């Protein structure tokens, strides 16, 4: 309740259960599609740890994801490569470095990794080598997103293992429910068709457009036109 007041938010019962799971477990996975409140949970747990003067480290696999994490939480986030002081030149170098990498323990009471679906097995191994005993690890991501470019499907495999406490957030919150991008992402994932123009409401954002083309060539030209 105190954290809710501090950051002026309201937590659903499922989000409160997620906070409890993080407090009760050393490793927790938070998964869910866009607009389901993952960021709200992250902001709340950060506030709780800040109140207790505990050290929290935020990170993500790419620069863009780290920047977005900083913007949404108000706390500094870094890329995993920067946090772990590693670099990738090519896959052969990465494999060689993987055998030699010892890592330096990360000084943190809580480590939160966002966009875990983008993390491959090499990067995950580096991270695990650098975690102090007793440090809590929160892994956040959408298991329905495409897996990492590198080897492995870390997030989905960890969930399927059943060895790690996993909370699946599935409620789309009011603000997110106004976005047709988010609504249609969930509909496609459920095997449903896109919302049509006729199904728009006064509250629905015009942020999703369906463009019909008559052939593959026309479709490719349209994509090129939109991107240039």
What are these regions, as identified by a protein language model?
Residues 1-20, 90:
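Pre-P-loop entry segment of helicase/translocase ATPase cores
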Residues 18-21, 144-228:
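Conserved helicase motor core of P-loop NTPases
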Residues 22, 33, 61:
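P-loop (Walker A) phosphate-binding loop of NTP-binding proteins
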Residues 38:
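Conserved lysine of the Walker
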Residues 41, 45:
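Hydrophobic positions on the alpha1 helix immediately C-terminal to the Walker A/P-loop
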Residues 55-60, 64-130, 171-172, 181-182, ...:
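Conserved P-loop NTPase motor core of helicases/translocases
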